[in-house]
């Protein structure tokens, strides 16, 4: 038996050495060769607003510049696109193997029968197709290993994008790009009439439910072609050339292409006719893409999409990657606003400075004027400190999911929100947005938030409006009359972001919640009388908070439970050692934490006392008086 164990042990060691040795040998062999040459083919029209980012991120690619050549064309532009391209070439053109460019600043700004710069007329299709065919010919002439067809709407934020794509050695591959919506640069389905077809696989790839490189019927906008593949000579964007190629391959018994003279569809069908697979790769977060505009759209809509993309970069990457120094003066952020509210607070833990910085980056990109509010840190609380504050817990409370008592993190979270309610009353702030520091904003947040607020003010009195939450799916939530973006809120988790009125703050303080404490996201549904636990609700006699919710929601958590990067300071903190009728209490898995600032103990006690005294004025107040 022992001899067998020794034998198998030696066998495993030998196998490991062989595999590891092969990997090392392969790596050494690869290091002996130059990276493949890449021709970047770029067509530009009216892209001055995005070119500084596009060119900066392209230049920042971790790929030898002497192995990259450019083929650039810019025409029919009425903005500063040509000037920006010339500026970039002046600074960086000599870094690359070669640059072939042609800029037409004297020609017409529009195409025949064009209704707007975003209209794709027949003449525009013909012109673009001819240019792409020219780029293909040039790539063959200079013996490029790859040609990378790029639109200027592509922002390759991953510096490993080009190196990763070329290493795949696929005949045709596109990096999967993110947008403000579900739009991307690939299709997973195509109808017999060459239209886009919805599939379940599309979302799986887009949301990276599965990771890798996947065969698809269509890629566009950012497409890398291996020019050394035998079938590459048959790839084309031209409809007539595709038909000619198909006719010359009659032995394949293929019907001639009868579809539209659309460059991306023709390219996909030419690959299909030649038996060349198209792939999309989502192994990296390669970057972002702007959605194409329709003929009736405006430049302002493109700028708004770019703002949304920059906000997504902050949420995904922590900050917008910087542009080249000489382009920095061209990067503008919107003027900051309070969304027609009196104030906006963001609750943040002092020991989470990275979250604060990320949120401040986000506010800068979106244009929000927000005050940082130091959170009460559960790690600085203990049972003695809690008792000194006069805090008592609701008898019988236990967390609905984990069946445990409250944690110090949850206590700190409640006190943080409570302090803002007190501040509102002190300063007589009529409407306030309260944000936590682990959120991402939905696209067009500013405009949608103002619309929701105006609807609420015009059609109904309110105390609280959820901007972000997790609703109980079974709960019925009727629409607010005469409003298309508001519902009457049902039982909800999380306090990611909500608008609170002064009247609402007074109602919450009047309930004296520190005398029967429960987590803040359980307390709020109790106060608008939609909590399913009637034992808890019975402890709060007056439950007349008027609570609404934006529909759809306007903000979401950055991470959900179980996802990479998810941290909960409320759930992972120490539990209280206080007896309740049911013994234990618990935490919600998807709620984030809040914390306490050193040196604020005295201020906190004063505010707690003031909150209790202020709550006594509530019965004499009406909505009209406030």
Curated annotation (Swiss-Prot):
It holds the Pfam family Glyco_transf_25. Residues 1-21 form the signal peptide. GO terms for cellular component: endoplasmic reticulum lumen. Its EC number is 2.-.-.-. CDD domains: Glyco_transf_25. Disulfide bonds: none annotated. The keyword Iron-sulfur does not apply. The keyword Glycosyltransferase applies. Keywords: Endoplasmic reticulum, Glycoprotein, Glycosyltransferase, Signal, Transferase. It comes from the Eukaryota. GO terms for molecular function: procollagen galactosyltransferase activity. A motif (Prevents secretion from ER) lies at residues 623-626. Glycans are attached at residues 113, 234, 272, 533. Transmembrane segments: none annotated. It is found in: Endoplasmic reticulum lumen. SUPFAM superfamilies: Nucleotide-diphospho-sugar transferases. InterPro entries: Collagen_mod_GT25, Glyco_trans_25, Nucleotide-diphossugar_trans. Belongs to the glycosyltransferase 25 family. PANTHER family: GLYCOSYLTRANSFERASE 25 FAMILY MEMBER, PROCOLLAGEN-LYSINE,2-OXOGLUTARATE 5-DIOXYGENASE/GLYCOSYLTRANSFERASE 25 FAMILY MEMBER. This is Glycosyltransferase 25 family member.
